[in-house]
Amino acid sequence: MTKKIITLLSTVLLFCNSLFAQSSGTDTFQLEKNTNGHYIFKTKINHQLMATIFLESGIHVMLIDSLYAFENSRHLNLDFVKTKRYERMNLGGRKYKITHKATGTIQLGDNTKYSGEIFVLSNYHSGHDMAIPIQRISHSNDGAHIIKLDMKNYRLQVLNRKLFSSEPTNYNTITINYDTYQNMPAVRTDLCFKHKGKRYTLSGNFVLDLGNASFLFLMKQNPAVQDFLKNNTELKIQTAYNKKGVPVGEAIVAEQANLCKKSFKQQIIAITSALPKFTTEGCIGLKFFDGSISVFDFDKHEFHFQ
């Protein structure tokens, strides 16, 4: 009898430890680079449906391809409402029709969830099923919006407050603000760069945009950018092309660049008019994060980076 009780207690303890580990741990998502230089990861949605997810922060809602959404509506468990008027969403200059909207929660792992608005886009399938803004992802244990982006090992983790407290302290820190189009996360800093032997500085507010595969986009419609270009006519501005050879904007080749007091060599600073509603001076892209570890504490408005 005693042996049975001990066995039962051991089983209960193992079960409780398993539950504790699931509720207090973190999910690790392995990132893969697609052909356009962006990052995706695969996970099981709501513990049952596999999905390929596009890593983003330059959007304000979750996006789902229409075909994927309706083929898997039962597993997604969302009430999609058809849009009453013609609506489009501009993603990097390409516009998609918004067919339906929903509000809800999507479980991305044992300890990770997305809560908020969800847009269904027509013909959005481009090697992924959905896109998720990291600022809307939280830990299921305490609801913390703390995202660790490890671009040394290409991993994404969602931390709770306790896990974050055990992180190394050798980070640089800058304040995140949301004074942007659609409240996207941004930082106020100086862009300093060297071009043709001369040094230039542009102060501004820059969106932290993980959907931008480049180093930096400057917004051509922004008054500060316009003044900067007008006052520095000696800058050699070249036509920028995508991988297919199609012109997509203009660019400045910088021998050296400094952004958020972080130094870089040989970077392309793109200038675009494809995002006319953006109000910031620019968007910081993925090449800023290459080979380093960053932590976004969206609750405390802090961006920690190495």
Q: Which residues make up each language-model segment?
A:
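Bacterial Sec-dependent N-terminal signal peptides
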Residues: 1-26
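Pepsin/retropepsin-fold aspartyl endopeptidases
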Residues: 21-306
